[in-house]
Design a protein with these regions (language model features):
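Gly/Ser/Thr-rich phosphate-binding loop
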Residues: 238-243, 252-310, 323
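Conserved AMP-binding/adenylation subdomain of ANL enzymes
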Residues: 173-193, 197-240, 254
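Conserved AMP-binding A3 loop
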Residues: 29-33, 150-174
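Conserved AMP-binding/adenylate-forming core of the ANL superfamily
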Residues: 18-64, 68-72, 89-94, 98, ...
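Conserved pre-ATP/AMP-binding loop-to-beta segment of ANL
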Residues: 13-16, 137-154, 161, 184-190
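Conserved ATP/PPi-binding loop(s) of AMP-dependent carboxylate-activating enzymes
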Residues: 317-321, 328-355, 390
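Structural core segment of the AMP-binding/adenylate-forming
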Residues: 7, 48-49, 72, 76-134, ...
Length: 482
């Protein structure tokens, strides 16, 4: 198997693969012939610089065709690609490099300052350099096995540092299940998954799942703007729109909704959508938002099927062939039935093969009499904000680096638009006073220390943190007091 050969090279060369809407307003259509050639020449360029099967290539590129071709070039060589979101800070990037030891970093030139500050100690190439996509060498696609490594993505990190999740080649082919039964584009459709490059959902739904169904992908390399989002859906005649729950919430709250002429499917994943948002979208567009569920380690496990019964608030049923059950309130999966299940973790702290036996998701889920599943919350303390999964440990670590902070605990606080936001309860060192000015200073400090979406939007002061007898912070008490 090889995704580059079996899907990209095998497609009709003249068929539409990508519609590019660049940050500067440019628009360009890319045919499969152009994508295949650009990826093959980039693969040749990388091979000449020592990249081969099993080597890790990190990308730090926005939602641009160059990112897609870099991914396909890695698939072509059998290299392992680690797409990173552009929001990462130098400390995030340095930590990732320390875990995965990339042979090469491919980056957007707009991220040059961040990469230079990270001082990664490995070769970095920028996608605007001459010869990357139009060089003389064309690499042939190697033959790969389902369990050969393919893709790396990082978890959010709940009890410690984020873990590097390693997927095999089967992860790519395995997307056919959710592509058919949940995303569900038709051949020739235009699909827009708005997730930024580097996130788990973007790796599978921006272009992999659409191409498996014979559809094209829209790439929009710009910040989220509610009005612009709807205008672009109409102008580009998007057929299937895949957005984060927060994006659906914000658009419903800030922009008058209307039906789009070509739009036939709305899907969402990452966290539950409240009934009022679902009602507003369906009333305005005539379309239900079909929810789905998955994890970094598992890929997608459930989905509300296209054309089937819709249960508001449900994340659907298990995808065909996937065996799920609930044990003591927690959703559990049989890895043998999950074609996109991961191979294991990388790194000294989380290294090793994927655990054998049932996979405990750590999510509390209930099931109704008809098998529809409803997400109730995490069994651990992960915060889901605007679709981002944020581990409290990382935010707490950033806060306690500030000279004013003695201790800090981070929990979720409810928010009408983002679902939840990060709430920090801070114990100050002697000589410091909790003021609005200090709260803003801690927020800016956290933004500088880690990815900006992780900063605490709510900062509160406490004389001490509630703890167990063994000294562990009782976050449940903090959540209940918020």
């Amino acid at each position: 198997m090889n995704f580059a050969r079996d899907v990209v090279d095998a497609a009709d060369p003249s068929a539409l693969a990508l519609v590019e809407r660049a940050r500067d307003g440019r628009r360009r259509e890319w045919r499969f012939a152009e994508v295949a050639e650009g990826a093959a020449r980039l693969a040749g360029w990388m091979r000449a610089r020592g990249v081969g099967r099993g080597d890790v290539v990190m990308t730090l590129v926005g939602n641009r065709p160059e990112w897609v071709m870099a991914m396909v070039a890695c698939f072509r060589l059998g290299a392992v690609v680690l797409p990173c979101p552009e929001q990462l800070r130098p400390t995030d990037l340095a930590r990732s490099v320390g875990v995965v030891s990339p042979t090469l970093v491919l980056a957007d030139p707009r991220n040059r300052a961040t990469l230079e500050a990270a001082a990664l100690g490995c070769p970095v190439a920028y996608v605007d350099e001459s010869g990357l996509f139009d060089g003389p060498d064309v690499a042939e696609a190697v033959t790969l096995r389902p369990l050969d490594p393919c893709l790396l993505t990082f978890t959010s990190g709940t009890a410690g540092e984020p873990k590097a999740v390693l997927h095999g080649q089967r992860y790519l082919a395995g997307q056919a299940v959710q592509a058919e039964h949940w995303l569900a584009p038709a051949r020739g459709d235009l699909v827009w998954c708005t997730a930024a490059s580097g996130w788990s959902k973007s790796a599978r739904n921006v272009f992999i799942a659409p191409w498996l169904r014979g559809a094209a992908a829209l790439l929009h390399d710009a910040r989220f703007d509610p009005a612009a989002r709807l205008e672009l859906v109409e102008r580009e005649r998007v057929a299937v729109l895949c957005m984060a729950p927060t994006e659906y919430r914000v658009i419903a709250a800030r922009v008058p909704l209307r039906a789009a002429p070509a739009l036939r499917g709305l899907v969402s994943a990452g966290e539950a959508l409240n009934p009022e948002v679902l009602r507003i979208w369906q009333q305005a567009t005539g379309l239900p938002i079909r929810d789905g569920y998955g994890q970094t380690e598992t890929g997608q496990l459930t989905g509300m099927p296209a054309g089937g019964e819709i249960r508001p608030g449900s994340m659907g049923r298990a995808l065909p062939g996937t065996r799920l059950w609930i044990e003591d309130g927690e959703l559990v999966a049989d890895p043998a039935t999950v074609p996109t299940f991961f191979l294991g973790y990388l790194g000294a702290d989380g290294g090793g093969e994927a655990p054998g036996g049932p996979w405990r998701t750590g999510d509390r889920v209930r099931e109704d009499a008809d098998g529809f599943l409803f997400f109730e919350g995490r069994t651990d303390d992960v915060i889901i904000s605007a679709g981002y999964r944020i581990g409290p440990f990382e935010v707490e670590s950033a806060l306690v680096e500030h000279p004013a902070v003695a201790e800090a605990a981070v929990v979720a606080a409810p928010d009408a638009e983002r679902g939840s936001v990060v709430r920090a309860v801070v114990v100050l060192r002697s000589g410091f006073t909790g003021t609005p000015e200090l709260a803003r200073e801690l927020q800016e400090h956290t933004k500088a220390a880690t990815a900006p979406y992780k900063y605490p939007r709510v900062v509160e002061w406490a004389d001490e943190l509630p703890k167990t007898a063994s000294g562990k912070v009782r976050r449940a008490v903090l959540r209940d007091s918020g």
